[in-house]
């Protein structure tokens, strides 16, 4: 099976739900204190996730306004920055790390906000004929095991091949926020299903009618996690979607192409041990920072700080 060398990150959204913080800052560049105690933009966490899973090249879909800032962030240290920093060792360590990451990165500009499907289609030349990993740029991934979320997905892909999406268990009152799917369990591979249906942000009634899974508790569904493995077939489906003008609220949806893949090829989904936190909304951003804090260098101090304030009692 072909080893996966490339990943794409979609980071061209306007971040309207995080306004006014995103007025001059791309939402994927919102800062978070990572588990190692270093403050980084969310986008860097995803690039590091990919590289640590063995990915060699990362294509980032950006908008025209954010491209220069993102490229500069992953660029070389400037003389002015060197003068500002007192801790020279930390400065050069982090600057060197950023430059190494930057050497793996290619930016791809989405000139108009035409949706996630359109953003993925723009990466066709970068990806070529290879299978690739796709990330949502406004998600922070936090593994609950020693292997990161991407490593878990790639281990499953080594058994399944084809198209593979990571999924998470989601209560029915939240399915309207996510692409939701169902399918048939695969007996020989735990926590993996053969996908038979995908619905973009279904109502509770739609989910109950067509997306129930016998292996899940009542009122719980599989929703997309934020990591997909695609083959070049996805571009054929996206091209058809775009050519036919199949939009939802003026945008080309990725799930439209994914539904086509379900009908024409092998499509799998796997439940992994971890969580994906959506920093595109205030609550998700706050949850991401708390989760990273509790899993990282400052965990003891953070827990002590919370206990001093009466824990989580309302």
Predicted regions mapped to residue ranges:
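Conserved beta-strand scaffold positions in the cores of enzyme catalytic domains, especially
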Residues: 29, 107, 163-165, 267-269, ...
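Conserved N-terminal catalytic core of the sugar/cofactor nucleotidyltransferase
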Residues: 1-20, 34-134, 141-145
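A generic secondary-structure signal
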Residues: 49, 53, 122-126, 152, ...
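Conserved core of the sugar-phosphate nucleotidyltransferase
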Residues: 142-228, 232, 236
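Conserved alpha/beta core of the MobA/IspD/sugar-nucleotide pyrophosphorylase nucleotidyltransferase superfamily
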Residues: 4, 183, 207-314
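A short acidic, often aromatic-flanked loop/helix-cap motif at beta-alpha or helix-coil junctions
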Residues: 37, 112-116, 172-174, 204-207, ...
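Residue-level signal for inorganic ion chemistry
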Residues: 43, 123, 138, 181, ...
């Amino acid at each position: 099976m072909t080893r996966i060398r490339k990943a794409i990150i979609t980071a061209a959204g306007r971040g309207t739900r995080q306004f006014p913080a995103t007025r001059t800052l791309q939402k994927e560049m919102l800062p978070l204190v990572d588990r190692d105690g270093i403050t980084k933009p969310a986008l860097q966490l995803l690039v590091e996730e990919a590289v640590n899973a063995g990915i060699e090249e990362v294509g980032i879909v950006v908008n025209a306004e954010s491209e220069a800032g993102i490229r500069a962030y992953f660029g070389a240290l400037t003389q002015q920055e060197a003068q500002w920093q007192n801790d020279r060792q930390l400065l050069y360590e982090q600057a060197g790390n950023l430059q190494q990451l930057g050497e793996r990165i290619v930016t791809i500009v989405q000139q108009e906000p035409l949706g996630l499907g359109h953003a993925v289609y723009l990466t066709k030349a970068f990806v070529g004929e290879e299978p690739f990993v796709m990330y949502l740029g406004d998600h922070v991934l936090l593994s609950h095991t020693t292997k990161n979320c991407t490593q878990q997905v790639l281990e499953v892909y080594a058994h399944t091949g084809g198209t593979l999406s990571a999924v998470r268990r989601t209560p029915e009152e939240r399915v309207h926020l996510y692409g939701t799917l169902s399918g048939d369990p695969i007996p020989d591979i735990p926590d993996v299903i053969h996908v038979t249906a995908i619905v973009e942000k279904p109502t509770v009634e739609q989910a109950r009618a067509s997306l129930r899974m016998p292996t899940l508790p009542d009122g719980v569904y599989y929703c997309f996690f934020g990591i997909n493995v695609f083959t070049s077939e996805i571009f054929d489906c996206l091209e058809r979607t775009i050519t036919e003008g199949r939009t939802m609220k003026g945008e080309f949806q990725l799930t439209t192409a994914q539904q086509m893949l379900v009908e024409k090829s092998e499509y799998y989904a796997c439940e992994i041990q971890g969580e994906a936190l959506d920093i595109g909304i205030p609550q998700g951003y706050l949850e991401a920072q708390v989760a990273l804090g509790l899993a990282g260098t400052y965990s003891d101090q953070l827990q002590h700080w919370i206990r001093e304030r009466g824990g989580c009692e309302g």
